[in-house]
Structure formats: structure tokens, C-alpha cells
From Swiss-Prot:
PROSITE patterns: THUMP (PS51165). ATP binds at residues 183-184, 208-209, 265, 287, 296. It comes from Listeria monocytogenes serotype 4b (strain CLIP80459). Its EC number is 2.8.1.4. Belongs to the ThiI family. It is found in: Cytoplasm. Pathway: Cofactor biosynthesis; thiamine diphosphate biosynthesis. SUPFAM superfamilies: Adenine nucleotide alpha hydrolases-like, THUMP domain-like. The gene is thiI. Disulfide bonds: none annotated. This is Probable tRNA sulfurtransferase. GO terms for molecular function: ATP binding; CCA tRNA nucleotidyltransferase activity; tRNA binding; tRNA-uracil-4 sulfurtransferase activity. The lineage of its organism: Bacteria, Bacillati, Bacillota, Bacilli, Bacillales. It holds the Pfam family ThiI_fer. HAMAP family: ThiI (MF_00021). Transmembrane segments: none annotated.
């Protein structure tokens, strides 16, 4: 069957009242970013639904791109015909023939918002249903649990027909809740935190700390690959790679071993917060899970958070490891995260880190070093890249041809 468009139904946007237009606009932007390598498609957003006009693009490829985009409740490959009963009959028959299985069942569900169409909803159901039955021998009607549900939507601009409804990712369009910086390590937890923040409409920019030669280029690439996984949900993720070697070496030399991790996290947070300010972000997201490691006790969080008044969002804070792993597997980040490349959170880790560090002592230890200058230097040398889901898909396809 040759579909000419995708019909997108909104999720929670239906509850957003006066802000609805803003949410629809943001969703349209995210859909457009996910289709950047498909210049022929056109996106048309309306108050209660959105259309992607395919113009010859592969509908199955478009379908795969739509599945992870937050803000979509469901979507359907569809065809549009003129406001003509005979055209509707022909399209309906073709759709059901394409979708049905032998000895299957079907129903017609029509909705007419354009009152000038000659048939009302019940008459459409009856006439189109009868026409399909007359032209297909191995098909029966089941109005309660059909194998194929033919949806017909009669509007002023035409009649839209579809037979499949595909569940979307739901949630809110990424960016509709503002921007935040995601502290993205190479571990399991932070990509999951980024995914959950995106689901609630937060546009994330990833911040990754890189400490060569202690951390390798493979570790850096792993973080970029994780950002690419997260880009599926918005179309694109900005990633900031922070050179952190000098700061970590100074911390190791100047700070007592038992609180190295606490001070390291404080410096990371200070850098991330300054990046947030420069990028007009509203919050910081991280993958901390309460009690999982020494730096994630309440006392440690208190000492680390003291460097900023910015809200810290911790989407996985109450989850145990198995719950986090399940989500990581679902979003296809787990296998990347467990690759054995050290990141800067694992180097210089003391054998017995303090789980209840005292803020006054931490600040005293830090006072003997000019961390301000080191932070400024790191900020001046940040590498920023844009990770785009469409470009990532193209690279995958190119490599696939080699094997």
C-alpha cells in the first residue's frame, strides 16, 4: 500500500490549554530534526493532530524515526482522498486488503467533522463496511475486537483513512520544559537519567569530562555514542567535552585521599553550572542513585551541591540498580555503558572514600588551591559537538555496506 502521510496524535498536549501551541511547535521542531536527511517530507501541525506529508519518502523509515519522539501518543500511516464517496470506497478496500489476514475480522470507525459530506458517521460505517465485505470473501465484521480497524476521518480538507495505530513514546516534547545540562559519564545511570528527563520535556545538553591519558579516546567515543542514543528522542543533542586532566591531577596532589571524590564532583558541578549559565539552562541532571556509591549518600550530596543554587534533577535517585539496568536495556544504552573503558569518575578513586564528608573541612582543603583559574582554563578549552540522530543513522548505513 502506498501511504502518502503519517497522522500523529498528541499525548499529554491535550491537557496544556493556552500553552498548547507552544507544545505543538516544539514537537514539530523535534520531528523535523529527526527527518533532516529526508528533505522531501513536509510537517503540518494542527491543534489536535499533526501530519507528515511523505512526498515519496519511505514510510517505514519515517515510522522508525517517530517511535522514540516524546509528545506523540500514537501515529498511523494514512492516505488522503477527496471528499468523494467512491474515492473513499476504493481507498478503504485497498487498505483493508493490504492489512487483513485470511479469515480475519474488521470494523469501520468513521468520524465526520465536515458536515457538507453527504454521509454522516453511521452511514459511512455502513456503506464503506458493506462495500469492503462485498469485495472480500474471507472477511467478517467484529465491532468489539477486530483484527483490522479501518479509521475514516472526514475533514474539510479531505478524507483520511488508516488501518494501523502505532503507539508513540508519550511524555512531553523535548524542550517544552526548558533546557538542562546532563552530566554524562560512560556508566549505566546517567544515560537513563537523560532519557527520563527528556520524557518530561527537558532539552538536555550533555557534559562529559575527559581526562587523557588516564581516560582513553575509546571512553570519549563511548560517551558520544551514548549521546547519539539519547538524540533519538529529540533529533539532536549538543555535547560538551570538558578537558579535566589538570584539575584531577591537582586534586590528587593537594586534597586528602578520603575526600578526593567529593572535591572532584564539586569541581565537575561548578564547571557544569557555568556551562548551564552560558547556555541559558535552568537545571542540571545527573544519574545519582541514593546510597549506590560513596559520593551518593545524602551527606555527600549536601557537600557537593553546596557549590551551586541551581536545581539538580536526579531522575533515578530512588531506583535500585536492576530497575536502572532494565531502562538502559530498553533504550539500548546498556551494552555501550558496560564497555570496559574507564571514565574520570573511576580514576584516582581512593580505597575508602568518606561517605559523610563535612562541608567546612572540604572548603578548607580547597582553599589552598586556585581552582577558579583551573576551572576557567577548562571552560576555555571545551570541545562542543552536535550529535544528530539522522546523521548517526546515515553513518550506520554506510558502515553496514562494508560488511
Amino acid at each position: 500500500m502506498e501511504f502518502d502521510r503519517m497522522l500523529i496524535r498528541y499525548g499529554e498536549l491535550s491537557t496544556k490549554g493556552k500553552n498548547r501551541k507552544q507544545f505543538v511547535t516544539k514537537l514539530a521542531q523535534n520531528v523535523k530534526r529527526a527527518m533532516t536527511d529526508l528533505p522531501e517530507v513536509r510537517i503540518h501541525g494542527e491543534r489536535d493532530r499533526m501530519y507528515i506529508i511523505l512526498n515519496g519518502a519511505d514510510y517505514q523509515l519515517v515510522e522508525e524515526r517517530l517511535k522514540p519522539i516524546f509528545g506523540i501518543q500514537s501515529f498511523s500511516p494514512a492516505v488522503r482522498v477527496n471528499l468523494d464517496v467512491e474515492e473513499v470506497k476504493a481507498a478503504a478496500l485497498a487498505l483493508v486488503q493490504d492489512a487483513h489476514e485470511e479469515n480475519g475480522t474488521f470494523k469501520v470507525a468513521a468520524r465526520r467533522s465536515h458536515r457538507e459530506f453527504p454521509l454522516d458517521s453511521n452511514e459511512i460505517n455502513q456503506e464503506i463496511g458493506a462495500y469492503v465485505l462485498q469485495n472480500m470473501e474471507d472477511l467478517t465484521v467484529n465491532v468489539k475486537n477486530p483484527d483490522v480497524k479501518l479509521t475514516i476521518d472526514v475533514r474539510k480538507e479531505g478524507v483520511f483513512l488508516s488501518c494501523r495505530t502505532i503507539l508513540g513514546a508519550a511524555g512531553l516534547p523535548v524542550g517544552s520544559s526548558g533546557r538542562a545540562m546532563l552530566m554524562l559519564s560512560g556508566g549505566i545511570d546517567s544515560p537513563v537519567a537523560g532519557y527520563l528527563a527528556q520524557k518530561r520535556g527537558v532539552e538536555i545538553e550533555a557534559v562529559h569530562f575527559h581526562s587523557p591519558p588516564y581516560t582513553s579516546e575509546q571512553a570519549k567515543q563511548k560517551a558520544v555514542d551514548l549521546a547519539a542514543k539519547l538524540a533519538k528522542y529529540s533529533g539532536q543533542v549538543q555535547m560538551h567535552i570538558v578537558p579535566f586532566t589538570e584539575i584531577q591531577e591537582v586534586i590528587k596532589q593537594q586534597i586528602p585521599e578520603s575526600v578526593i571524590m567529593t572535591v572532584t564532583r564539586r569541581m565537575m558541578l561548578r564547571i557544569t553550572d557555568e556551562l548551564r549559565r552560558r547556555r541559558n539552562g535552568l537545571a542540571i541532571v545527573n544519574g545519582e542513585s541514593l546510597g549506590q556509591v560513596a559520593s551518593q549518600t545524602l551527606e555527600s550530596m549536601l557537600a557537593i551541591n553546596a557549590v551551586t543554587a541551581t536545581p539538580i534533577i536526579r531522575p533515578v535517585v530512588s531506583m535500585d540498580k536492576n530497575e536502572i539496568i532494565q531502562i538502559a536495556q530498553k533504550i539500548d544504552t546498556y551494552n555501550l555503558s558496560v564497555q570496559p573503558f574507564e571514565d574520570c569518575c573511576t580514576i584516582f578513586t581512593p580505597p575508602s572514600p568518606k561517605t559523610k564528608p563535612k562541608l567546612d573541612k572540604i572548603e578548607h582543603y580547597e582553599s589552598f588551591t586556585d581552582f577558579e583559574a583551573l576551572i576557567a582554563k577548562a571552560l576555555d578549552n571545551i570541545e562542543t559537538i552536535s550529535v544528530n540522530v539522522a546523521e548517526t543513522a546515515q553513518v550506520k548505513d554506510e558502515f553496514a555496506d562494508l560488511f
